[in-house]
A protein has these predicted regions:
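Secreted, disulfide-rich extracellular signaling modules
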Residues: 1-197
Length: 197
């Protein structure tokens, strides 16, 4: 997020719900649009809650002062996941990666991705008062490991002379695939006021 209003240390709670279908671009969504009432939330789908403060006290000052650091609310989707067809995956990232290997063409653009792999998420405030973040981007990061060949340098000495040789070695590598929100990604806000007050 790019900033906030209120108390950055106020405890808040949100839940991320998996959508059953994407929100279409050619439709107008007003602030009273409720994805739950309109049937957009997948029954039995992923629902992950997170308690947070806008100022993350777990981030050290060196990291926070780095010009590339962006304040964020991080929700891990690392629990076992079952897709609409009933297939079980070790976590949501495994689901996304296996969908890529099954049908790479579903990753060619945002439209194919949201209509065939990840229809989206609905983030609902579940509790807390006193702060509001100015959300500027939503992003899905898939962390994964794979085996790959890397070039390593090996230094030896022959007759007091250094000899540098390169060799290919099979290693386990860690990477991240990021799926950031773009202009095709709809970010809508549902506002409901306390009608009793």
């Amino acid at each position: 997020y790019s900033g906030y209003y209120g108390d950055s240390l106020a405890t808040m709670k949100m839940t991320a719900y998996e959508l059953d279908r994407p929100m279409e671009e050619d439709k107008v969504y007003y602030s009273n649009f409720n994805p739950e009432k309109e049937g957009y939330i997948r029954r039995g789908g992923l629902a992950k809650s997170k308690v947070y403060t806008l100022y993350d006290v777990n981030v050290d000052d060196d990291t926070r002062s780095n010009s590339s650091y962006m304040e964020n609310i991080h929700i891990k989707l690392d629990a076992p996941y079952r897709d609409k067809a009933g297939k079980q995956y070790s976590n949501y990232g495994s689901y996304v990666m296996q969908k890529y290997y099954e049908k790479p063409e579903n990753f060619k653009d945002a439209y194919a991705f949201i209509h065939n792999v990840v229809p989206g998420f609905y983030f609902k405030n579940q509790g807390g008062l006193g702060s509001m973040g100015y959300i500027t981007i939503s992003q899905l990061n898939v962390y994964f490991k794979y085996k790959g060949w890397v070039t390593e340098n090996d230094t030896t000495y022959v007759n007091d002379k250094m000899v540098l040789t390169e060799k290919q070695v099979l290693r386990t590598l860690a990477r991240v695939a990021s799926f950031a929100g773009t202009e095709e990604v709809l970010q809508t806000t549902n506002i409901s006021n306390d009608k009793d007050g």
